[in-house]
Amino acid sequence: MGDYKELLFYQKAQQIVIGVDALVKGLPKTMQAQEISRQLFRSSTSIGANIAEGHGRHEGAEYIHFLIIAQGSANETDHWLNTILDIRLSQKEKIQALIEINNEVRRMLTATINTLKAKRD
């Protein structure tokens, strides 16, 4: 198994982090926006971190476990991005692009998890 940085879903997860970093720097300095910023940044960085950690476990049950955690973090990231949209903290276009990349990552993680589970069974 090559380097985790070669995985397309890892690369896209890093694109999310870069986009989220730029996004949160532009959010208002209100208590609500700052709390959402912290949660969003934490969940978005967790996606790639769990992909990387799981990749070191190779193809066993532990790898699947970490990919499932990454998927949960991607779901949480989706929640926070949609919350920002719902309460109108940022421009829809900026958020929508991140949601689309995040949705790609979620689909890729689901497909990879299903493939690994099928190989195991």
Named regions from a protein language model:
Residues 1-121:
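Amphipathic alpha-helical assembly/interaction segments
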